Amino acid sequence: MRLTTVVASVNNNRDYYLFIPKQTLFWKKFGIKFIALFVGTSIPEEIIDCSNNIILWNNNLDINTSFVGQNLRMYYPALLDMPSDELVMITDMDMLPMNSKYYCDGLENFITDDFIYYRYIDGNQIFMCYNAAHPSVWKKVFNINNEQDITKQIYETYNVSYNGVPGSNAWFTDQEIMYKKLIDYPNLKVLNRPIERIEMGEYKNHMERGDENFIANYDDAHFHRSYTNNEHLILNAEKQL
């Protein structure tokens, strides 16, 4: 198997959707296509140039669209049309890749029916970053055959107390669903692969010391929930790629 496609989803929160051009660029550097699922009625003008990498989702708009965005990425990969040896992986919109090795090494050892979870199982949760499978497996695990199935799943799992505040009530619904759906899947492959992640405090320390080419030491960078606040760091990472 080989990783060819990465998917993330977002609503009309500008601090998140401004990541789309850089997600597209960063993954393209590694020969991987990025697809953004945009929850809303239309694509914002400032990212319209990325339209070829954006799929508009205008369903479930009567509930909190942050919830829709968090959960949509679990379901939509089932609808992608890809060759049997290709994988689609999901990610967070504010998480950018620093190399391809972490995501691609060893994938040739897996088969079409495998669901690959890169990290470790945390209680009754499976982290969104990172999971990869062929669309047929996403379809089988989540019982998705069309957009109507996705719309229904999102409504059925919606918690009315969800407020979109990170860490608050129902924030981890997506990770809990992922666990429930996957834990008994016979071809779940848990890699327990350690990850070298750079957070923004550490990134700023590198910059203040005048370090160069340091992103090669990391697998991903978490530009914590804001493109605008971290744009100078993102542009620095782009130069280092």
Give each language-model segment a name.
Residues L18-P21, L25, Y75, F172-K180:
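A structural signal for well-ordered alpha-helical segments within the folded catalytic domains
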Residues Q125-W138:
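Short glycine- and hydrophobic/aromatic-rich loop-to-beta-strand nucleating segment
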Residues L61-V88:
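A conserved donor-nucleotide-binding helix/loop in the catalytic core
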Residues I90-L96:
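The conserved acidic donor/metal-binding loop of glycosyltransferases
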Residues K139-L241:
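Catalytic core and acceptor-binding pocket of nucleotide-sugar-dependent glycosyltransferases
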Residues L96-F127:
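Conserved donor-nucleotide/metal-binding helix-loop-beta segment in metal-dependent transferases, i.e.
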Residues N12-Y16, L96-P97, W138:
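Short acidic, S/G/P-rich loop/turn micro-motifs used as interaction or catalytic elements
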Residues M1-D62, S84:
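N-terminal anchoring/stem segment of glycosyltransferases
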